[in-house]
Every structure is written in C-alpha cells, then in structure tokens.
C-alpha cells in the first residue's frame, strides 16, 4: 500500500519544492535590488545628517576659535586668469583673478566613520565664517570677491577660491611710452581683524599664471607677492602686496605712430631739396606741421595728463615740430634770398661772396660758382681798341662803348641776381645736410637707448620662461 501510494505523490512534492525555491529567488533578487537602490539614498541621508549636526548651532558671524587669544591663520594666494585692460588715462588696471584662501574652522570637524565615510562637503560661502580679506586699492567700489561654495574637509580645513574682477589703482609712468614698463600693485588684507585675530600667511610668492589668457597689448614680466605689516598705536595689521611688472607690446604704436612721425620728420628734410623759387616749400612744411599737431592730439587722448614727465613720443613730436618750424623760417629766408636783386638790396658784402660763392660750395660738394662779374670786368678793363685819328671812327667807337657799357650794366644786374640765387641754393643744400643730420641723430638719440633697455628686459624674461 505504501509503495503504490508513493508513486503519484513524488512528482507533486518535487514541483512544490521548485515553486518555493523560485519564489525565494525572486524575493532575494528583489531584496538585493532594493538594497542597491537604498545605498545612494543612505549616503545622502548621511550628508543631510552631517550638515544638520554641523550647522545646528553654527553662527557664521563668530570667529571659529576655541580660545579668545587664538588666531586664525589664513593661507593666501593669488591666481590671475586675465589682464583685461590697463587704462592709462584714468590710471586703472583691470584684472580677473582667483583668491585662494585656506584656514581651519574648529567648529566644522567630524568623524567620517559616523557619517558613511564622508570626508569632504561643499557648502555656500554665505553659510560659514569667511575672512573679510579685501583689495585695499580698489577703484570701482567692489572690494570683495564673488560668493562661491567652500570646500570643507573632515579635519576642519576650509578652502575657498572665489573669482573676482578688480579695477585697481595703478600709477602710470609714461616716460618711455610706448616702450614703457609699469609696476602695478594689489594690496590685500583683512578689513576689520587685526593680526592677533587673523594672520595672513603668503602661500606662494609667485602669482599662479597657469590659466592666464594673454593680453594683446601688455605682457606680464613678473608677478610676485610679499607680506607686510601695518602698525598703529594698539594693533598690527598684516597684508599681502602683489606687484605686477607689465610691459607694453609696442608693435601697434610703432607701426601707426612712431614710423609716421619719423617719416614726417624726414619729409621735412626734403623741403630743402625743392628748387629755391618754389612757393610750395612753405605749403609742404605747413602740411607737415598740421599732421604733427594731429598726432599730438591723438597721444593726448591716450596718455594721462601729467606735468611731471613728458612721454618719449611726445618729446619726439615736440622735437619734430620745432624742427619743422625752423625749416619754415629757413625756407622763408632762402626764398627771400632767391628773389634779391641790385635794385632792391645793397651790394653783396665781400665776406658773403667769399663764404657762399667760393668756400661753402666746395664743402657741400656743389659745382663751383664762377664769378663772371669780376672776370668780365677785368677783361673789359684790360681790353683797349686801336685809336683812330679819324673822327668817324671816334664817333663809331663812342657809340660802341656806350652800347658796351649798357650791356655790361645789364650783365652786372643779371649776375647779381644769379649770385643771390646761387646763395639761396647754397643755403638750401647746407640746411638739407644739417637737418638730415639733426633728424637722424635726434631720432637715434631718443629711441635707441629706450629700445636697448626694453630689449634687455625682454630677452632675459623669455629665456627664463623657456628654461622653466
């Protein structure tokens, strides 16, 4: 009986066991999936719990120290991302920087094991105590950086790197414009805390330029920081000063300002190469003078108005304007000499004839002027016609002598005019070489020393950057 009854029951029992096992497997898979989904939510709960515990009794206006005499040490650094502009007229430097600050907040410490292994959290800077470090020499009224999140570690280390756009005051020295170097400083310090409460530690003497975006007009030669202290009757106040030595890239001003000015100065020299009787010489000089005046107005719009120093390009323009003014005066004098005659002026002095008709032409490589007046006069005085006893011949000779004297008088007048014209040519040639020499020496004397100094600063900086 037991054997017959056990046959049909065995398949049923096996089917029941498989069904129960399948249900248990589904339940286990569902439980595993539920545990996988609940793991991230548990981390978020841990972080929520951590933030509630940290900021439950936290007051961000209170300096986070355990004892009253403890001071907070702020590790301070600066990273520059862009030199936006240098306004010479208003003497401002605009920069985009990052203020790197790090300190210990004793009220923001926790044990990572109690909060699911969380070691770092990020909270808005408005929720924690932050040092009131500002830029002292700000020029636009914005003394602090942007409110961004702080990074807090479990040991209480708070790192805050807010970006900031600053317009800082910068005394512009335009002596060597456009080959100038400027030294602009940015001074940071606490606005209310003294050194016994908040001390600033310079993290790195060099400004971080790894993310710097090049400027098309200025190049940063060096950017270094130094720490200082300001003391008064009761307290001392630490501060950090960053000095930016920036160098102007002069290519634009060289092409569109200096080279045209040099061209105008040499164009003035060519005035003396025109014929002495040309009235257009005055027009050319006047046109050059007007052009230089326009250049002066352009420079006046760029550089700051200061009576302490005169910029290099301003000195050159003033030099060229004096140069052109003298050329106008000399040209007027030469034209006056050119149009002189015996009927309008007295006879030429012997020393004038000797210097301008004999000596200077040889020195100026001009063809020697033949003194036809004296030559023809000597030939006339040395020549004598035969004496005729006949009255008709005497009468004819008297007529010839009269005609000869008249012709000689006209020749004398013509030769005096030609002598004055030749003196005008000598003056033009003399001033041509004189003004050319002065123009070359003046241009080289003004620009070469400055360019040499500028190159000596530029080359070592690039060599040092290449070695790095």
From Swiss-Prot:
Catalytic activity: Ca(2+)(in) = Ca(2+)(out); K(+)(in) = K(+)(out); Na(+)(in) = Na(+)(out)
Name assigned to this protein: Neuronal acetylcholine receptor subunit alpha-5
Gene Ontology CC terms, in alphabetical order: acetylcholine-gated channel complex; neuron projection; plasma membrane; postsynaptic membrane; synapse
Listed PANTHER family: NEUROTRANSMITTER GATED ION CHANNEL
Encoding gene per record: CHRNA5
Superkingdom as given in the UniProt entry: Eukaryota
Disulphides: 170-184, 234-235
CDD domains documented for this protein: LGIC_ECD_nAChR_A5, LGIC_TM_nAChR
Membrane topology listed for this record: Multi-pass membrane protein
Ranges in the topological domain labelled Cytoplasmic: 338-429
Function description: Component of neuronal acetylcholine receptors (nAChRs) that function as pentameric, ligand-gated cation channels with high calcium permeability among other activities. nAChRs are excitatory neurotrasnmitter receptors formed by a collection of nAChR subunits known to mediate synaptic transmission in the nervous system and the neuromuscular junction. Each nAchR subunit confers differential attributes to channel properties, including activation, deactivation and desensitization kinetics, pH sensitivity, cation permeability, and binding to allosteric modulators.
Record note on quaternary structure: Neuronal AChR that forms heteropentamers composed of two different type of subunits: alpha and non-alpha (beta). CHRNA5/alpha-5 subunit is only able to form functional nAChRs when co-assembled with another alpha subunit, can be combined to CHRNA4/alpha-4 or CHRNA3/alpha-3 and CHRNB4/beta-4 or CHRNB2/beta-2 to give rise to functional receptors. Interacts with LYPD6.
GO biological-process terms attached to the record: acetylcholine receptor signaling pathway; membrane depolarization; monoatomic ion transmembrane transport; neuromuscular synaptic transmission; response to nicotine; synaptic transmission, cholinergic
Taxonomic source organism: Pan troglodytes (Chimpanzee)
Keywords on record: Cell membrane, Disulfide bond, Glycoprotein, Ion channel, Ion transport, Ligand-gated ion channel, Membrane, Receptor, Signal, Synapse, Transmembrane, Transmembrane helix, Transport
Signal sequence, start to end: 1-22
Subcellular location: Synaptic cell membrane; Cell membrane
Glycosylation sites: 155, 183, 229
Record-linked Pfam families: Neur_chan_LBD, Neur_chan_memb
Signal keyword on record: yes
InterPro entries per UniProt: Neur_chan_lig-bd, Neur_chan_lig-bd_sf, Neur_channel, Neuro-gated_channel_TM_sf, Neuro_actylchol_rec, Neurotrans-gated_channel_TM, Neurotransmitter_ion_chnl_CS, Nicotinic_acetylcholine_rcpt
Family indicated by similarity: Belongs to the ligand-gated ion channel (TC 1.A.9) family. Acetylcholine receptor (TC 1.A.9.1) subfamily. Alpha-5/CHRNA5 sub-subfamily.
GO molecular function: acetylcholine-gated monoatomic cation-selective channel activity; transmembrane signaling receptor activity
